[in-house]
Amino acid sequence: VETQLVIASKRDTRRYRRGEIRDDVFERILQAGRITGSGKNRQRRRFVVLRERRLQASELVTRPSNVRDTPVTVAIVTAEGSSYSGFDAGRAAQNMMLAAWDEGVASCPNAIVDRDAINELVGAGDGEDVAILVSFGRPESDKDPARKSPREWYAGADRMPLHRLVEYR
């Protein structure tokens, strides 16, 4: 799928159908996160794949069903206190979510409500912190990104218009 189409049509998904994500597809999603750049190329992040423990993790986010009802959730663990850690985690999460959508896999980033508990659950070590949880699964209903052009997706998005968002100086 064309890059602009993937970006324009990607929406956070909170309803998933049952079923696993094929291993080869999931590996490509993880590779998209791995290949993401990082501040000063420090690469101070790791990914913890939650399959069995995702039910426990679901109680530690703002919307439990986002994690509970998916086959897999990825915790992005970063170096605590690094000035780049949140930035790097966001970049990796977005790459994984876009790669997933390109494969027909939906995703949703999840805000953490109990940081200490999630750190313990995923085995974050001293000096590490879970920055974000991203859930992945097949969307409840089939969504064909190509049913609209990128221009149509952009025009129909419930987002602030570009002319109000951007200023030139």
What spans do the regions from the language model cover?
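Acidic, surface-exposed loops and disordered segments
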Residues: 1-169
